[in-house]
Amino acid sequence: MKIDAILSPAELPALAKRDLRNAICVVFDVLRATSTFVTVLHHGAKAIVPVSEIAEALAFRQKQPDILLGGERDGVRIRAAQTGGVDFDLGNSPREYTPEKVRGKTIVSTTTNGTRALRACTGAQTVLAASFLNLTATAQFLRRIQPAQIVLVCAGTRENVATEDVLAAGALGEMLANETIAQNLKVGRAVPCPPRDEANIPVQQQSHGAHGLSRHSHATAEVSRPTLSDSVETARNAWRKAKFNLLEVVSEAENARRLLAIPELHDDVAFCLRQDVYNLIAALGRDGAIRISI
């Protein structure tokens, strides 16, 4: 098993040209797209469809009036002045997406970097959306199916590296490469990590035909030592240094500083850095929608 990492959005065009047919790509946009995606799914949404542009989201609404529109620009929910008359139902704060609002719904969410990263992976066997919130579940899935190649994809911020994405990729790389942790993943034991606020929640038993996923994918495989690229080692080293004061480290980064400066979004940073709150796999389907898969 070979593990590589894309740490900067500048690398995404090259990723899109790679042969990924035997690869699983894991996309991180911790603040906040992929954290919101897994929260939405945990709270009972049917699916979430990521798009890049406001116009794409509005086109979905015209075809399906019952969908919810989610998204932000500069951290703030999209309003009628930006769309020509339509207020979006939700922003990009995972705390907005309560069960009461999203259960049974399909959400179309406009997010620039997150969508760009997901689309760069469309040639992959499987594309997963991951965050700190569902990190161990994602690692357990990868260890079970033992793909030939894993690519950890950091969405970044605009054209820049995002500290929180690199740290999440490093944490997942550590889970997959550390033999003690890997053995625990193989047998389904909990993986030790810094304290968090909530206990694990059982996986929702659904399957929606995502990229390369099937029920037999969870057969237990022998744990083998993966081969790591330099970029994965870089992310692992960053994670090891930051993991015991994660909030403090991330709060100094660009994305977090922007959110912390907006009173109603201040708490999103700590929310998105909690580990293993949701025990689910979020997979991108061939139809462009992200759903829970087993």
Predicted segments, located by residue:
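Structural motif
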Residues: 3-5, 23-26, 46-48, 66-69, ...
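Residues that scaffold, gate, or flank divalent-cation-dependent active/transport sites
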Residues: 6-15, 19, 34-45, 55-61, ...
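N-terminal glycine-rich anion-binding loops that anchor highly charged ligand groups
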Residues: 23-37
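Short His-Asn-centered micro-motif
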Residues: 28-30, 51, 109-111
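Long, charged alpha-helical interface segments
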Residues: 80-106, 110-116, 120-126, 163-181, ...
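Short, structured patches in soluble enzyme cores that scaffold and shape functional sites
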Residues: 109-113, 131-132, 152-156
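Glycine- and Gly-Pro-enriched alpha-helical subdomains that act as flexible
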Residues: 133, 137, 141-146, 159-177
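Intrinsic disorder/low-complexity segments
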Residues: 179-226
